Amino acid sequence: MFFVITIVLCFLSVAFYTLLERKVLSYTGNRVGPNKVRLRGVLQPIGDAVKLLFKSIFLPSSSNSVLFFVSPVASLTFSISLFILFFSSKFWRVPLSVLFFLSLIAISVFPPAFAGWASGSFYSKLGGSRNLVQTVRYEITLFIILLFPLWVFNYLTIHSKATVASFMLIVVISFFIVLLAETNRAPFDLAEGERELVSGFNTEFGGRGFVLFFLAEYAQIISMCLVGSSLFFCGYPVFFSFFTGLILVLLTRSAWPRLRYDALIIIIWTALLPTLNALIIFFVFL
């Protein structure tokens, strides 16, 4: 029963987070946003989901049918697993819970790449390969960030009593940048936002397949914001920092232009990694 309730809460969170995103983007662009569907637009995401679920499924003739259908399901499964495990208090308080979280994040890289390859489309393959390269490179930084509490405070659980963010603001900013890159959010949405990619790895997906990838992406955003708020802001109200992170993700999309691919790589190799390595040397050896 716990798993069913948590999955329903995950879907509702994604639904209303998308509504919040459309409202924030509309207000930043001096527009109104959804306001016609029942209760002044509150039920708009539910109506959109129902419409997409009843659309027909198109299978490209050159695609791998097994991976084409399995990839969206696997992507959503990994994202929901992150969401479920966060609310399982017995799990997150055990040793090495951060490593298990990193394992799920690492595995979640493969479904979009397999989806791009299985679609049989040049645009999908190119988008899937870019998504794989981008996320794998930023996972190195994510690994260092999430293991930082181990080196500094000798603990490796998500729920901790230490307040890290009070003197490690650089680590928190780095985590936010990695969050945007790992979840393909602006300004790092290069796997599906570039003109030559059409829609990236999910170009050939519509209806239910698109819904599953959509739910997986937003569920991963919410999960990573929850983990970041618990890991770095335990001395403060966790939900305040959690909602602040969600709003910052939306404001970044509305205010920051998309970066070039070379700038994406330069940030990781010349800014984030050297800075974090210097912090590790400072806290561990000094």
Where are these regions (language model features)?
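Core, highly hydrophobic multi-pass alpha-helical transmembrane subunits of bioenergetic inner membranes
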Residues: M1-L286
